[in-house]
Amino acid sequence: MINYAPLWKTMEEKHISSYALIEKYGFYKATIQRLRKNQSVNLRTIDDLCQILNCSVEDIVEIVLEPDVPLPRTIRRQP
């Protein structure tokens, strides 16, 4: 599962608000809502956030493994 909790912490540390992302940097409100709901966004959005916040991907997103969720047939976990 994708979790954007690190993004909100990084934004707070860098004194950048959601409002600033929308008004100053041209983010769509819908994109901010997708991030708030931990929904998928494209890599360009992640890259833009990294550039604006001067941070790495790990400062924006974390992957939380869900062991009980079956993987698609195309993805196999190594033992």
Segments (PLM) and residue ranges:
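Short alpha-helical DNA-recognition segment
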Residues: 15-33
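Short, charged recognition helix plus adjacent turn
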Residues: 9-10, 62-79
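Helix-turn-helix DNA-binding elements, focusing on the entry/boundary residues of the two helices
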Residues: 18, 43-46
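Hydrophobic micro-packing sites on short alpha-helices
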Residues: 45-50, 60-61
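Alpha-helical residues within the helix-turn-helix
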Residues: 12, 23, 51
